[in-house]
């Protein structure tokens, strides 16, 4: 393939309190390294701490990172100004929304070169909607074409490409008459993240008395991330509402995760470790899970006492027997290494949860409804008894993600539509 675009400026790295968010940027960069190695991707981060910068230096030693912001006088640093001058395209990285309006608007006014979105969700319903994935799909179909704000539609319609990380976003944007960009399925960049810190992982397992291939990981979550508490800010009214929802549902939801832990220990005879995808989950696990797990099982359960780095997490996931997660990105990281995984989807979660069905694994997702405990017990029992089908499922998800990422990367670089590459789980596949 002959490239028409040689330099991509990636606006990404939204947060460091979630290893899933941390994985977005290096995942997108790895996708370009694998499928368009002749292209340079420059990372323009929103938020990076030294821990994450160190990981990037080890995982992607050739990656150029430029810092700075945009204001009335333009770029705040010479390095950002140079990156903008040299970029053929501005690319909004994978994430929960198309939220970098200031940067996109400035680029449109002052630069005029192409821009696009790579692996994003645009959820018109959540929050505050509480629904299963089938219910969300029905609601998306019922929204009027005038639902999205005009400025959002204009920004999306002005893009060169909008690659949606799941088909509910794709359906939303099509129904809202977003017609000008190459509007297509394009997976979350996290699917391409493959870096691990095997040394740190081995040290952690040794310290906890765990053996590679002989333990399972369990990831807890609240229905809403408590950002006011995480960042030490005064809560807004909406955050107060979310906190009330969290407090009312935490026992119910974590009881399902506890059922998965009980089943794993009982059926496999092997230990479990409870680990965080987000920083607040360390306290959450210690406060709630011991009382939800039986005393005879609790001796086989380790609770990680710190928020771990992404590369250590992937190193542990890569040598585990199973990852059961209430967060969306740990199953992605596990699937990359062909590890059996289950995603427990809470009813407040966004349409991003659809991504697994789009990649050919709808059964990877278990909705936290009234049947969830029984469903997860059966699923964990099956994996503990015969993991081969779940290993094959994870391999399939990773392979399908690679195919879709390859198409998205090459289309972005060539400045051409993806074409007929529908997601595996879609009706068009």
Language model: regions and residue ranges:
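Active-site anion-handling motifs in enzyme catalytic cores
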Residues: 2-429
